Amino acid sequence: MIAMPVRMQQGSEGDGGGPSRGTSVITRTKPKTKKPSLYRVLLLNDDYTPMEFVIHILERFFQKNREEATVIMLHVHNHGVGECGVFTYEVAETKVTQVMDFARQHQHPLQCVMEKK
């Protein structure tokens, strides 16, 4: 909240148009905006999806370069799950849907999920 003192002009207020000697305070309130919740998009390991396909997914849908995609893919392979990125709800939901649809089109059982950070 911001408070600013304001001097009143002569004849603008008072008793019948005479000079006013008071001051008024005008307050402006800024609405508090809440940052949107963030969601992690995760790939889950399976025994059937080729590693090269996972790298392609990371490059295509998450704009990872070859090196970053390979590191994430190996993490998924070795640990069972890996983070592709952190996004707002709508973006994360869209990415999960895109990955799942693309994997199904290519007949791979790859799973992609999102969880609140």
UniProtKB/Swiss-Prot annotation:
> Could you tell me the Gene Ontology terms of the biological process aspect for this record?
protein catabolic process; proteolysis
Sequence segments annotated as region (Disordered): 1-33
Q: Which family does it belong to?
A: Belongs to the ClpS family.
Q: What binding partners and quaternary form does the record give?
A: Binds to the N-terminal domain of the chaperone ClpA.
Q: What does this protein do?
A: Involved in the modulation of the specificity of the ClpAP-mediated ATP-dependent protein degradation.
Q: What is this protein called?
A: ATP-dependent Clp protease adapter protein ClpS 1
Give the species this sequence originates from. Answer: Rhizobium meliloti (strain 1021) (Ensifer meliloti)
